[in-house]
Amino acid sequence: MPRSPASTNSVSSRPLEIADRLAFVDFRVFVEPQQGATYSDQLAVARAAEALGYSAFFRSDHYLAMSGDGLPGPTDSWVTLAGIARETSTIRLGTMVTSATFRYPGPLAISVAQVDEMSGGRVELGLGAGWFEEEHQAYAIPFPPLGERFDRLGEQLRILTGMWKTPVGQTFDFSGKHYTVVDSPALPKPTQSDLPIIIGGQGAKRTPALAAEFASEFNVPFVPLDTLKTQFARVADAVAAAGRSADSMTYSAAFVLCAGSDEAQIAARAAAINREVEELRSNSPLVGTPAEIVDKLGPFREAGVQRVYLQMLDQSDLDHLELFAGEVIRQLS
């Protein structure tokens, strides 16, 4: 298991080392369907994102709205992505993030591998420990203490990767504290030989260690620049301690999107998601005019952010994606 950062000095210097070698790779669309979206709504966003050149469509994996009534109700993330996989052709697909509390590791390995095959090898798995206790209570899902949730996450990652990497014709076994696998044929296999795994969050020790052991991408969602730098540094130290090359990890961030050609359009989009413009501006670099957003992204780029997830909360506003692609991404490409 990779160690935690050895000293404060190593943490503070690491973001500059990251920034020296990285630039934005791509922009991805990220939706929250539990707030109120049908499968058709999500498909429309995915198709628009694909047509506009975004590299990926990601969705949350939640069963309960954080605010509002969430009508018409939640949609299952992997059922949804299976459908979208058959109705798109190039855009990558994934979860940000699947909760390890929702599914047993064996069935999850099967579902992810199947959707990867259905998509022709375009799936990525974001996996986390789970945090939203109310949704577990609402849908009869056990919600163990935080330490146990992280233990289960680690075991799930070992089982998922173990099953996928077991050669065809051989079997996989695992004996852990929470899960046991006996004589599994470890089928089906994903289409991708090394299906990307994304781990994220702000945990100081176990999160960076798990990322260094299992992930090809580390994501920090909705945090200020200083917090992002600190967490990227922890992960970079863990990657180095694990003996991995520095460029084997992609560093990403997620932010709320609220862009407009002028202040009136920005205000209208903020109102559509029941947020105040100034509050959004203070918490996300993706809020403002295209020129403003390009400027605000600069420090995040310098801090080592390679990939940006646009949290699109109003899924009916496809013009929003068009504006960002045409006026922001164009300036950064």
Describe the residue ranges of each PLM region.
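Active-site-adjacent structural elements that line small-molecule/cofactor binding pockets in enzymes
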Residues: 2-3, 9-333
